[in-house]
Amino acid sequence: SIAVRVLSFRQEPINHDFWKRKLEIAYDMRCAIGIAINPVNDTYRLVHGEGDNLPGLVIDIYAKTAVMQAHSAGMHVDRMVIAEALSEVMGDKIENIYYKSETTLPFKADLFPENGFLKGGSNDNIAQEYGLKFHVDWLKGQKTGFFVDQRENRSLLERYAKDRSVLNMFCYTGGFSFYAMRGGAKLVHSVDSS
């Protein structure tokens, strides 16, 4: 288990302004490298925990919905402030914020989080990744609903799939399978139990 999560090495209040600044940095970086504003992708990881100096927080964007997941008690406690800051940073780019942390928080923290919308409520859950459209089940699916961090690996598979047979074990949404088919695989088998 993780004993300490460091949000800042400066003495500063962890408040709305802090969250807004951190989320702006994360969003600006994704814009600069072409992830956040992309005509063939409307799905990306906005916050990747420690990678964005926000340990214990994951925020994935699926079209107009942000799915927020807390992995620490502190993130859970600040979820509403984080959601407000996220709304300000993203503006009209997101209409919904879904909080999904029932299974990710430490059981010893005596927290009883409930999944649910913190903003909006639309279940328009079609997300686009390199032109492919996926149904994302953030309500009941694993993690935030889709393994966003595997996008480049799926794209890489597409380049190697031509005339090959592909076995996609633990396929979940079948993302790798669709890329393999689009890449010209002669046969694709997808297996999952969830």
Annotate each PLM feature.
Residues A63-M75:
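A short interface-forming secondary-structure element
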Residues K119-S194:
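Rossmann-like S-adenosyl-L-methionine
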Residues N15-K22, G74, D78-I82:
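Short amphipathic alpha-helical segments
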Residues D17, R21, I25-A32, G91-D110, ...:
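A short, charged
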Residues V47-L54, V58-D60, H76-F147, S155:
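Non-catalytic substrate-recognition/targeting regions of SAM-dependent transferases
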Residues S1-A63:
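Non-catalytic accessory regions of SAM-dependent methyltransferases
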